[in-house]
């Protein structure tokens, strides 16, 4: 009985070790790592004018909670 409990715990440990070992191996491999030189998002042009008016304020007809707090 004690041997079967030990065998079950040992098999669970080996299985988890194989799963996590394969995950860390794929993370460490060069194919899985994204180069820092590559752009992941488009840059935002800060020179563009922001749209005037808040769509929430326009829809409600009153100041939204965000702008109400900003004015007071």
Swiss-Prot record:
GO cellular component, one term: host cell nucleus
Subcellular location, record wording: Secreted; Host cell; Host cytoplasm; Host nucleus
Keywords: Host cytoplasm, Host nucleus, Secreted, Signal, Virulence
Keyword Signal annotated: yes
Record has Signal as a keyword: yes
Main location (coarse class): secreted
Extent of the signal sequence: 1-21
Induction profile: Expression is induced during host infection.
Transmembrane segments: none
Function noted in UniProt: Rust effector delivered into infected tissues to modulate host functions and contribute to pathogen virulence. Enhances leaf colonization by the bacteria Pseudomonas syringae and the oomycete Hyaloperonospora arabidopsidis pathogens in an Arabidopsis thaliana infection model.
Family to which this protein belongs: Belongs to the CPGH1 family.
Entry protein name: Candidate secreted effector protein MPL124499
């Amino acid at each position: 009985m004690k041997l079967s409990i030990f065998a079950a715990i040992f098999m669970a440990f080996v299985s988890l070790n194989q799963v996590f070992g394969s995950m860390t191996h794929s993370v460490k491999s060069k194919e899985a790592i994204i180069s820092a030189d590559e752009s992941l998002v488009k840059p935002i042009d800060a020179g563009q004018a922001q749209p005037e008016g808040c769509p929430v304020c326009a829809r409600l007809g009153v100041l939204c909670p965000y702008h109400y707090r900003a004015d007071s």
